[in-house]
């Protein structure tokens, strides 16, 4: 039987429209179908209705297929965007504080078709030990893995036996456990959507299963059993910060970023995991993967069409080399199509193995920023030949610090001028308010107020609208006294190194520790040591049962240097690292 394209599309459209579009499922997409549209699809867009069209497939010059998506009218800023030309600039912003820090977080969907970023904040994750938690999760292929990580990461971290004594090991263990949970049948997805009750049989609970491939739309009742599918091409990065006393511990998987400001100088506490980074590329190629980039057509300012190189991607699909989930390519969680069970987690094309760095809060520590790649990474802007979108380079870590400083200082100057106008010039220049004239002094006075952080964080996110990506940031400001240590925890002396290792390793891996610039990473009994990324000016050592290499690189893909392990660690140091007498 032959079904004509117009008839086929009409049947699909009728099927989709027949489903009610007003049932409440918490603001998420209600369904998707296929329809054929003649002419300009924007003519079929109702900005005030429940439906919008998403380009899907063009068969010829007449029949163009679009996915017809049901969405709630009163959707939040985290809902689906209608078009790349209709940015969602509304933001979800929060703030809070305890006796050591104050924070503001902001997230904006921007020009993306959907919001796939998520974040989590726990100011008092462990009140007895003065522990605060902040995390940014940048999803790809969908938002569900990022949402699950935001819901579970800090909870699982608190459950770790090593949480009180070894944060580095605890973070690494949580990444492995999260990846394992994503393979569990339906459990993790069910926790995201508790309204999907297996006992419900009402017809109003029928909904569509949205497939990210866009190939079809399945209709099922929530009371029916649905076979579980691994999030093959869905995953999330994770950049988590744990502040305990005067110590900052950062765990990073993927291309989100954490940057610390000291006296106005940016200090990277994470490294972007990109496929073209030499160490990442080496791991990918070793297990049979490929890394390449493609050219995209674009219009320049003169209206001429030109080609621009896109980002390096694994298998031409994934632009981050570490994340959660996956089996062929891996990211912090998900991407099971990129993972191979033959290899250990450290050696996957896309691995969930985190980099851990530790820094101390000192008197000149001002604030830190955790941001998704919508703020800090290079973005490809031109996808529409009918409209000119200039290519936007990334904000460097120093750019981010300078931006925050500028906004906070302008607020101080306004407050100072206001005091002067009120005849209180003397108060403006007291010891606590000299910040009005010196941008390098930590902005810790209560004069600034939470509104300043709130506004600054929102402006930082809004500044990255041109990246055509979701933008999420957490701005954490340190209060006076934040540099004071808490009583030493059991088995950890002040100034001692923590040991970071994999969750499945009975003997801890060599420390993956950085006191701002020095890192030591490696494994025991591992034939191929996987080294963390190397930052400019840092010294890293990879240790194993046999020999280790140190690789240094630059963004241009520079040469490698070797370091003899004996020159870095003597017998006494090795005994200390392995816990031997």
Curated annotation (Swiss-Prot):
SMART domains: PP2Cc. Keywords: Hydrolase, Magnesium, Manganese, Metal-binding, Protein phosphatase, Signal. Belongs to the PP2C family. Residues 1-21 form the signal peptide. Residues 102-478 form the PPM-type phosphatase domain. Mn(2+) 1 binds at residues 138-139. GO terms for biological process: signal transduction. Residues 538-563 are annotated as: Disordered. SUPFAM superfamilies: PP2C-like. It catalyses: O-phospho-L-seryl-[protein] + H2O = L-seryl-[protein] + phosphate; O-phospho-L-threonyl-[protein] + H2O = L-threonyl-[protein] + phosphate. This is Putative protein phosphatase 2C 22. Its EC number is 3.1.3.16. Mn(2+) 2 binds at residues 138, 373, 469. Binds 2 magnesium or manganese ions per subunit. Disulfide bonds: none annotated. CDD domains: PP2Cc (cd00143). One of its GO terms (molecular function) is metal ion binding. Its cofactor is Mg(2+); Mn(2+). It comes from the Eukaryota. It comes from Oryza sativa subsp. japonica (Rice).
């Amino acid at each position: 039987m032959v079904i004509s394209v117009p008839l086929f599309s009409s049947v699909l459209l009728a099927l989709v429209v027949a489903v009610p579009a007003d049932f409440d499922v918490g603001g998420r997409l209600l369904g998707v179908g296929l329809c054929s549209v003649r002419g300009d699809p924007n003519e079929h867009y109702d900005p005030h209705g429940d439906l919008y069209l998403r380009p899907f497939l063009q068969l010829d010059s007449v029949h163009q297929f679009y996915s017809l998506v049901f969405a709630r009218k009163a959707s939040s800023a985290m809902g689906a965007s209608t078009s790349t030309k209709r940015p969602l600039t509304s933001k979800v912003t929060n703030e809070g504080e305890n006796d050591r820090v104050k924070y503001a977080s902001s997230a904006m969907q921007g020009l993306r078709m959907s919001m796939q970023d998520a974040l989590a904040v726990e100011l008092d994750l462990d009140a007895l030990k003065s522990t605060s938690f902040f995390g940014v999760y940048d999803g790809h292929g969908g938002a569900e893995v990022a949402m699950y990580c935001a819901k579970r990461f800090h909870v699982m971290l608190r459950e770790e036996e090593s949480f009180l004594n070894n944060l580095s090991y605890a973070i690494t263990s949580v990444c492995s456990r999260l990846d394992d949970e994503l393979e569990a049948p339906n459990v993790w997805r069910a926790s995201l959507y508790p309204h999907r009750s297996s006992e419900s049989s009402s017809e109003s609970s029928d909904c569509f299963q949205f497939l990210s491939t866009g190939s079809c739309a399945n209709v099922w009742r929530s009371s029916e059993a649905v076979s579980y599918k691994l999030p093959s091409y869905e995953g999330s990065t994770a950049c988590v910060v744990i502040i305990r006393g005067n110590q900052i511990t950062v765990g990073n998987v993927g291309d989100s970023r954490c940057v610390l400001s000291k006296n106005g100088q940016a200090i990277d506490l994470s490294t972007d995991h990109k496929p073209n980074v030499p160490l990442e590329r080496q791991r990918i190629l070793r297990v049979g993967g490929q890394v390449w980039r493609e050219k995209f057509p674009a219009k320049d300012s003169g209206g001429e069409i030109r080609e621009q190189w896109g980002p390096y991607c694994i298998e031409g699909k994934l632009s981050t080399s570490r994340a959660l989930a996956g089996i062929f390519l891996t990211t912090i969680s998900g991407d099971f199509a990129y993972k191979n069970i033959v290899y250990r987690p450290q050696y996957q094309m896309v691995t969930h193995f985190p980099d851990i760095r530790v820094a101390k809060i000192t008197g000149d520590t001002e604030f830190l920023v955790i941001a998704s790649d919508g703020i800090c990474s290079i973005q490809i802007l031109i996808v529409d030949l009918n409209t000119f979108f200039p290519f936007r380079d990334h904000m460097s870590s120093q750019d981010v610090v300078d931006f925050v400083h500028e906004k906070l200082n302008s607020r101080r100057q306004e407050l100072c001028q206001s005091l002067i106008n009120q005849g209180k010039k003397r108060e403006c220049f007291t010891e606590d308010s000299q910040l009005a004239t010196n941008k390098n002094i930590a902005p810790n006075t209560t004069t600034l107020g939470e509104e300043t952080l709130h506004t600054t964080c929102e402006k930082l996110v809004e500044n990255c609208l041109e990246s055509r990506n979701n933008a999420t940031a957490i701005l954490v400001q340190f209060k006076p006294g934040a540099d004071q240590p808490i009583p030493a925890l059991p088995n950890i002396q002040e100034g001692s190194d923590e040991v970071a290792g994999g969750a499945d390793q009975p003997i801890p891996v060599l420390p993956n520790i950085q006191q701002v610039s020095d890192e030591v990473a490696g494994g025991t009994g591992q034939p191929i040591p996987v080294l963390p990324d190397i930052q400019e000016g840092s010294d890293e050592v990879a240790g194993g049962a046999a020999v280790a290499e140190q690789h240094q690189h630059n963004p241009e893909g520079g040469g490698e240097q070797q370091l003899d392990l004996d020159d870095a660690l003597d017998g006494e140091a090795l005994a200390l690292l392995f816990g031997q007498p």
